[in-house]
Every structure is written in C-alpha cells, then in structure tokens.
Amino acid sequence: MFLLPKYNSFFIFLLLASVIPILAFSISKFLAPNNTQGPEKLTSYESGIEPMGDAWIQFQIRYYMFALVFVIFDVETVFLYPWAMSFNDLGLSAFIEALVFVFILIIGLVYAWRKGALEWS
C-alpha cells in the first residue's frame, strides 16, 4: 500500500508555508524604495536622543542563569496546561506520567538551587 495520497494536504500546507514567505519577501524587495544607508541609519536608537556611551554592555552570567531557569519552568507550564485541561479524560497512566515529569523538573530545580544558580549575591 502506498500511503502518499493520505499526506496530500500536508504537502500542500508545506508548499504554501514555503512559497508565501518567499513571495512576500520578493514583492517587498521589488516594491520598496531603494534608500541608501545614511549616517542616521547606522546609529543606535535611544528614545529619540543621541546615544551616549557604548551600545554593547556586558551582562553578568547570573542574569542568564535566571533566564534559563525561568524558561525551563515556563516550558513546564506550557506542557502541564493541556494535561490539566483534559485531566478527567486521560486516566491514571497520564497522571503518573505527569508526576514523573514534574518530579524530574523538581530534581532539576534542586540541582540548580544547590549549585547556587538561584543566588543573587
């Protein structure tokens, strides 16, 4: 049995998802005015005033650690929300799987806590 006809709608979607952005960028390239880059275009924007100082600032690593921990637990929330919405229909096995998922994330949180990733000092 050849299953390719079952995937026709998927291939059409894939084709349209590829063609529409290329078409939009091409039309924009041909219709947009051709402006040259002046010195104003090359400066950074700071609330409508002339920029003062260097635009490249180094951030401390602790900001990245907080951001990483936040993203991990934000993704956890995204995964747990659909599960919570269909909790009654899924049964005991889905509940156990969700508990294992949360337990693994708690282990990660304890590890980050013990390593000092959550300390602000």
Swiss-Prot record:
Its EC number is 7.1.1.-. GO terms for molecular function: NADH dehydrogenase (ubiquinone) activity; quinone binding. GO terms for cellular component: chloroplast thylakoid membrane; NADH dehydrogenase complex. InterPro entries: NAD(P)H_OxRDtase_bac/plastid, NADH_UbQ/plastoQ_OxRdtase_su3, NDAH_ubi_oxred_su3_sf. Belongs to the complex I subunit 3 family. It is found in: Plastid, Chloroplast thylakoid membrane. This is NAD(P)H-quinone oxidoreductase subunit 3, chloroplastic. It comes from the Eukaryota. One of its GO terms (biological process) is photosynthesis, light reaction. Keywords: Chloroplast, Membrane, NAD, NADP, Plastid, Plastoquinone, Quinone, Thylakoid, Translocase, Transmembrane, Transmembrane helix, Transport. It is an enzyme of class 7 (translocase). Signal peptide: none annotated.
